[in-house]
Amino acid sequence: MRTTLAVCVAAVGMFLSAGPAVAHHAFTAEFDAKKPIKMTGTVTKFEWTNPHAWFYLDVKDDSGTVTNWGFEMNSPNMLLRNGWTRNSLKVGDVITVEAFGARDGSHIGNAKSVTTSTGQQLLAAPNQGQ
């Protein structure tokens, strides 16, 4: 009887913990595939961390106002498979990013690809929202 109870408690615990794990990785919860954005800016920070790498860009609009944007990417392991390294971006690099914008209109996006000033294109999230 104790074994059955322990198995039931463990199973319920697994089911209850699965929801938050899936929600954390839900692209559509935070980003909108119908809001593609493309912008060029200067890298201010590059975080090569799990579970998702991030980079930040200073982007100047037509009036000269600079806004800092953050872009989420896949995990470093997935990025390595697409040709990235922890040194692919450096503070001061000028890059162009294609991404999907945030649902709430904040200055973040889910990066799809990055093009460096030399013309090299790196895929950041080939399976997201496409």
Regions found by a protein language model. Name each.
Residues 1-7:
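Positively charged n-region of N-terminal signal peptides that target proteins for export
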Residues 49-60:
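Short aromatic-glycine-enriched beta-strand elements
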Residues 102-126:
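OB-fold/S1-family single-stranded nucleic acid-binding modules
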Residues 73-81:
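Short, structured beta-strand/loop micro-motifs enriched in basic residues and often containing a Trp
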Residues 41-43:
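Conserved hydrophobic positions within beta-strands
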Residues 19-23:
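Sec/Tat signal peptide C-region and signal peptidase I cleavage site
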Residues 7-18:
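Bacterial N-terminal signal peptides
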Residues 81-96:
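Short nucleic-acid-contacting surface segments enriched for D/E, G, S/T with interspersed K/R
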